[in-house]
């Protein structure tokens, strides 16, 4: 009820900014997670090992900070709205180009470029949203906005279930051009950030490093926090379909269904903990959500039946995406005004860079245990859940800060 009341209180302009950012992140994640469902098919087509194709995930994640910096600085200088449109169009074009890659080398190059484009969307979209909405709505909106990622994974699961056997992996990537249509919606209905319009962009003419003076300690903390968070999400999601196929030998329909169940849990967790963070505070909500992963871990990784695995997936993603649902508002509140188009996205994506080895590491470790993916998935998830609890406990927050004020400078 709290979430609905906050959404109803938004003006049409505020809702449009939120919807555009949510859909942008949803479709961004949709394009990214098509890889998770097609690793085996791509490897077979290119006649290489799955570990070689899995490097495309690592490469995409590693390139995202480049996009976060480039598009973030452009958004700080020229506005959130136009740069968001260019960025969405670019990652849609690169997704469809991936469908026509003639070999693994070209495919990897295109996935790296896709990572640059993907890296720009989250930071720009979140800054546009949180600079547009009232302070009281930040927690509720944050939980929904971040779960655009889970919705994208869910959408990829449905497309995999419905179309993969018919159109193959190349056809799946062609479907990934759909995000380009969102540009039309943004062009027609979305307004520029009021904070940016009030003149905050003038500060962005400063060199980024000059604007960050006095904030480097904060930046270092956030990068470490986001590294742990990215291990948390990618460690439970990227190779989960491969875990179901290889370790449990489930068919495509069962894999899709269990992935869908997990993503429903992710949406529930993100919305629930995002809203609760308005009452509990950002750090306490992150701690509670992360701790939930520990008792769920044995069920999620080591259950043997589809029903129990589905229950484990649902509960695990409530935990993982419950913690993640707080991140958009948390990072935007911590960000200095002059670099809000850059700071949240860059910190997030630098965390992605340092966590980019996750997929390659988990595949490598699974091969050491006769392709038993349960062990690497459980190991990564358990360790990083504890690390996140510690980092949140010793960290800072600025819940309720007024953007454009001296406190937010």
Q: Which ranges hold each PLM region?
A:
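Cytoplasmic helix-loop-helix junction between adjacent transmembrane helices
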Residues: 110-147
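C-terminal transmembrane helical hairpin of 12-TM major facilitator-type secondary transporters
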Residues: 277-327
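Cytosolic juxtamembrane N-terminal segment immediately preceding the first transmembrane helix
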Residues: 1-30
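Helix-loop-helix hairpin linking two adjacent transmembrane segments in secondary transporters
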Residues: 145-187
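Extracellular/periplasmic helix-loop-helix junction of adjacent transmembrane segments
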Residues: 36-66, 253
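Extracytoplasmic gate region of multi-pass secondary transporters
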Residues: 35-36, 216-267, 355-359
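Helix-breaking motifs and short loop linkers at transmembrane-helix boundaries and internal kinks
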Residues: 47, 79, 100-106, 134, ...
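Conserved MFS/SLC helix-loop-helix module at the cytosolic interface between two early adjacent transmembrane helices
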Residues: 66-102, 280
